[in-house]
């Protein structure tokens, strides 16, 4: 069992490690490694996504940076004072987060954006350690059902007691868990997400 919140050299999931190697061959300028959490280490607001996107975090090395989902997310973070900029384009830009931290349930890019159960479980110890650093009365935002379930698992809670639902708020004792549909292009195009529902989760 690891006590880390991140391991940049992790290759514990053979399928993901092989896939990253293949992607790196096709896109040699891409980051193509486990993507670390980003933001304020002492934040009381933690955002948990699913996994790095092919041409977003997997390219730039920073969560939700350089793709459609990031455009939507950082616009909201900037609007409510958590981000210095409303666009996150590259890991070396000047964007900084205040009292906010962003991570993923799975730290490596999965094929077709779909990690399998064993991969989610392998990465779950990192997420559990990250959750353990949160202060009392913090808020965790789960972007999507997989992120929600990974959080519940990391806390050793019963999934049946905490069902995922868009805009659902769960009291987990030490902090609260807020659910939202993931702000991916796919969900947005299907009208599952839009700026107004996300505004309602502030």
What do the PLM-derived regions correspond to, one by one?
Residues 1-164, 173-188:
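A polyanion-binding, active-site-adjacent surface
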Residues 192-197:
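Conserved small/polar residues in nucleotide/adenosyl-binding loops
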């Amino acid at each position: 069992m690891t006590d880390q919140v991140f391991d940049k050299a992790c290759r514990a999931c053979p399928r993901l490690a092989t896939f990253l190697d293949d992607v790196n061959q096709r896109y040699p300028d891409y980051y193509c490694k486990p993507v670390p959490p980003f933001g304020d280490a002492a934040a009381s607001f933690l955002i948990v996504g699913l996994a790095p996107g092919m041409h977003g975090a997997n390219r730039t090395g920073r969560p939700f940076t350089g793709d459609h989902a990031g455009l939507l997310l950082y616009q909201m973070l900037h609007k409510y004072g958590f981000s210095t900029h409303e666009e996150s384009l590259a890991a070396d830009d000047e964007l900084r987060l205040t009292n906010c931290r962003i991570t993923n349930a799975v730290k490596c890019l999965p094929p077709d954006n779909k990690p399998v159960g064993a991969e989610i479980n392998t990465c779950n110890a990192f997420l559990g350690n990250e959750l353990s650093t949160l202060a009392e009365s913090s808020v965790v935002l789960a972007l999507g059902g997989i992120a929600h379930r990974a959080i519940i698992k990391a806390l050793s809670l019963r999934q049946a007691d905490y069902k995922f639902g868009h805009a659902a708020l769960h009291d987990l004792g030490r902090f609260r868990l807020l659910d939202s549909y993931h702000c991916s292009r796919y969900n947005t195009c299907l009208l599952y997400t839009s700026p107004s529902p996300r505004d309602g989760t502030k």
